[in-house]
């Protein structure tokens, strides 16, 4: 059952009203007044049952989720900071200053799973609505990046060691008597596999890696022999994954780089400081003039950039039409998207080596592709100041949700900074007027 925040206009002798503590001209207060909380409650209220215990109010949990993404907090830290920050409490709909945690941080996990991709796209559309010009912007810029997964750097030795450890855990859980556990041996072999590039350690490291794989295969076969048929069926997918990890080579297709995140891909973007990144490919779509993100789409594996255009523009259209906007008519990209010139009604513009027919067209193209480079710092902000840089959420749904949430946080932070700039501008204007008046009085 959907819970609601009851507005309390009566004074309380033992509690302090937030409006008596905070500055009502603060940018976060202004931002809270601009967000359509009623629309969020109406849309997300459909996801709750009509029976059972009242849930956490949507204004509270959605507000905290927005604050978390704006200021790059974790599930735990945002709840802790909420207790000590009166502005954050006002943002989430409280009337009086609270001194206890609003809910357990694990509630964020359930809320994200409840919203899914459709709910987060609606939330993204509401952040686009805060920027009226963005929903009808004709030209957008598109680029791809890698959303890295929070996994250990994958090596054959480490993956084989994890397979061995997992087999030991399964044997202990199912009471299977193993001929040998290899706990001590595998630990030493993993150490021997370190620094295999050194000439004096190369031979030893190669032998250690081979031995770890041999032990892993041996333990998997032993479990397949000794486990009962019904139990073996439960672990069938796990054992297939272990076998694939233990036999994959350098040139193997669809390699597994993490046992707990098997969807992780290895992507090379040509960076000098980071040759390979392990995660998922994400396409970012931003407006040319406003800089607002209208689409941030996750893709499985490592598809060619041109293959991401159709779904990215479709998501941008869905997000913008939810707030009365239109589909972009022009999308400027880099040369990595070559091969596509039109996606439905959207023209794809790519830099060409051929000269334009006139000086004017040359200048228009030059300005367009200079402006397109602005998406690079946008991606940098998404990674450094929001959650796109390292994804801690589990599974494919975690990849999708984390990408969308980073875009939501970016759009909100943009509006927050705009409000802050407006306040500073009016203060400067007021100081200028007062200074002019005092100067005239002194001259008289």
Language-model-detected regions and their locations in the chain:
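Helix-centered, glycine/charged polyanion-binding patches within enzymatic domains
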Residues: 321-397
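Basic, low-complexity intrinsically disordered segments
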Residues: 48-57, 62, 69-132
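Electropositive, glycine- and tryptophan-enriched low-complexity nucleic-acid-binding patches
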Residues: 271-319
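Flexible, glycine/threonine-enriched loop-and-boundary segments that flank and lead into catalytic domains
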Residues: 259-275
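Basic, amphipathic alpha-helical segments enriched in Lys/Arg and hydrophobic/aromatic residues
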Residues: 246, 363-444
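Short, conserved catalytic/metal-binding motifs centered on acidic residues
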Residues: 26, 64, 78-79, 104-108, ...
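Active-site- or DNA-interface-adjacent structural scaffold in DNA-acting proteins
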Residues: 95-263
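Charged, often Cys/His-bearing segments associated with DNA-binding zinc-finger transcription factors
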Residues: 1-35, 417-444
